[in-house]
UniProtKB/Swiss-Prot annotation:
It catalyses: ATP + protein L-histidine = ADP + protein N-phospho-L-histidine. Residues 186-238 form the HAMP domain. Its main location: membrane. This is Heme sensor protein HssS. Residues 246-456 form the Histidine kinase domain. Autophosphorylated.
Amino acid sequence: MFKSLYTRIAIYTITVMIFSAVASFLCTNIIYHNYLKENNDAKIMRTLKDSIQYQKESRIEASAPFFKHLGEMNYQVMTISEDGHRTYYGTEFRKDNISKKTAESVLHGKDYHGIKNLPYNPIITGFFENTTKNTVGIAYQSKGHTYAVFMRPDIGKTFSEFRIFLAILITLLLLFSIILVISSTYAIIKPIQQLKRATERLMHGNFDEVIHVTRKDEFGTLQYRFDKMRLSLKQLDDMRQHFVQNVSHEIKTPLTHIHHLLDLLKFAKTDNAREQYIEEIYEVTTQLSELTKALLLLSEIDNGAHLDFDDDIQLNQLIKKIIRHEQFSANEKDLIIMSDLETISMNGNERLLHQAFQNLITNAIKYSTTGGMVDVTLSQNLETITCTITDDGQGMSAETQARIFERFYKSSNHDNSNGLGLAIAKAIFELHHGTITVDSEKNAGTTFTITFKKVPKTIS
């Protein structure tokens, strides 16, 4: 029953209405008991005394017709004679609970203020308590006899038409309130139901249907943010599919090549041919191994919450180490690697930064012309640390520069790389609050600029 938010809000609202009505009744009852009851008692007592005085001044001897007339004027009257006989006029009392002692007290001339002294009852308002105890009383003398006269307003007759009006009013009030509560609840719940359906579509991979903003309140903000989330999920899903396609292609191509080489090896007739095929198979499997390592590293970076960035890194020493390691590759192309490295330290993940800078320096050597030069600089100011890696290779077009950091992007079909090196480097630098930019012109070389924001070291 309460699994639906629509039902829950409607029931809660109606419950609040009922609770408010009960609380209002109790508060009104308390106000009547503490502030209005005494005034009501005095007013009815004054009416009774004025009526008796009028009867005396009018020299009306017969008391029964007079009290009957009071009953017809929407009052309930009870008289008690000296011998205890009780007579009722007007509408019958629900209960006669005036004690004999009280009657005798009134017969002896003491006024009775039953309305003022009626005990508090949280369930029934004293104004509507239709008992002889809830009356005012005085002594009345007629033809040499004394009577105790008790009187209260006949609420039933006095407010008979008003009660019908009030009953209709309350019924319509409740009816319209319930209808409006249900309608307003539906208006509140409708955008939530739309978002619920939208999340179900997202769960099933449907990222194309737009979530429209239909309101300008908090629900509208929620709709807007859900639609932004949908777009982000769509982008991630597109990237995932593209990634899977690229990985499949990068794995399928060398596997096909290996399969072809194995067929050739199977039917090779000379030892030289067999050695050549084995060497080519080794090269292809090495490429596959490098691709696997790169994919594992990407996965580690993408799920980087567990990574530690507390290593105290001597950045200049790290770059020098990479240059020494790659010196053999540079010598094979008669390259000169120039370096101007300031002594700089920073906190981070040394293993990842080593991989990122190695990717950049390896690329610079790979794409530099034979006999050329690679220039590496490292400097800092008060706010940033900057490293530049420049080669004098063939450069790249504006289109290539715009896409160079995309995963699996290759500027040429003849490129035997896996297209992940720069994407990995960029992701690593961003994990270290850094950025990487490229500046290149065709046949004029390429410069990669890495900038880190200085982060104050925390004292543990």
